[in-house]
């Protein structure tokens, strides 16, 4: 009987390992540029995720969004902050989303493309560098505060992105006075006076799943287990 039990345990363990190995990692196009970051530690964090990725920087990044080049990827991970985007690149970006390519917008990528109105519809929100209009009234530019303690609350415990996540604290850069569309699905919130009400949400654009996660400024966030888990599950879900 003992031999049978040992054999069954070995079989189950072997089957589990084979299943894990056979599950291909999510193939990610990782885009940066327009904002500096601690490359060594950020890339070390990415290596912990169930992904394989190619890294491209601006000004060459938009070329990778063309249909014949983006096809090989499951998800685009934005950690860039360019100011402008050419009309042709806008068309490629939208065409990519209309075909269902997953998109994860991380931290300062929330602050990109001030002059492109469609970007707020894609992301479901925007960090405004300049005064902006809401309900007919002028709003002040958005703000940022480094090294801010944020108490984060899980708004939807059943969503795949927040599965296994409980409320947590994180030291990160806070974004205040931002625009968030009422049509997004809230996942993580905070009541910090220095930050907008949400730090993570999902949106739909075209046929694509879009995730916005405003956390992730530096190693204080990148080493936070809750942040790593949320980012990992966001990429998998967006696929």
Regions found by a protein language model. Give the residues of each.
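Short, solvent-exposed loop/turn segments at secondary-structure junctions
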Residues: 35-36, 83, 110-111, 192-194, ...
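Helical hinge/lid and interdomain linker segments adjacent to catalytic or ligand-binding clefts
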Residues: 27-31, 37-113
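Extracellular ligand-binding/catalytic regions of CAZymes and related secreted enzymes
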Residues: 23-26, 194-196, 204-239
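Catalytic beta-strand/loop cores that center a nucleophilic Ser/Cys/Thr
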Residues: 40, 44, 49, 140-209
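C-terminal motif of bacterial Sec signal peptides marking the signal peptidase cleavage site
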Residues: 18-19
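A glycine-rich, often tryptophan-bearing local segment used as a flexible ligand/cofactor-contacting loop or short
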Residues: 83-160
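Short, solvent-exposed loop/turn elements at domain surfaces
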Residues: 36-41, 86-87, 195-198, 220-224
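Sec-dependent signal peptide recognition
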Residues: 2-10
């Amino acid at each position: 009987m003992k031999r049978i039990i040992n054999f069954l345990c070995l079989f189950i363990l072997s089957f589990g390992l084979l299943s894990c190995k056979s599950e291909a990692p999510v193939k990610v196009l990782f885009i940066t540029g327009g904002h500096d970051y601690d490359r060594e530690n950020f890339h070390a964090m990415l290596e912990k995720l169930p992904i394989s990725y190619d890294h491209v920087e601006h000004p060459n990044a938009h070329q990778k969004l063309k249909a014949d080049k983006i096809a090989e990827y499951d998800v685009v991970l934005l950690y860039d902050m360019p100011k402008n985007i050419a009309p042709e690149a806008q068309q490629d970006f939208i065409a990519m989303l209309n075909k269902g390519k997953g998109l994860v917008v991380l931290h300062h990528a929330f602050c990109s493309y001030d002059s492109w109105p469609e970007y707020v519809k894609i992301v479901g929100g925007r960090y405004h560098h300049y005064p902006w209009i809401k309900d007919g009234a002028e709003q002040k530019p958005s703000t940022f505060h480094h090294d801010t303690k944020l108490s984060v609350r899980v708004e939807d415990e059943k969503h795949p992105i927040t599965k296994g996540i409980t409320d947590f604290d994180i030291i990160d850069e806070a974004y205040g006075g931002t625009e968030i569309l009422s049509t997004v699905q809230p996942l993580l919130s905070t009541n910090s006076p220095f930050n907008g009400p949400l730090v993570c949400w999902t949106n739909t654009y075209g046929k694509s799943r879009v995730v916005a996660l405003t956390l992730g400024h530096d190693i204080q966030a990148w080493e936070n287990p809750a942040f790593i888990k949320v980012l990992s599950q966001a990429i998998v879900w967006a696929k």
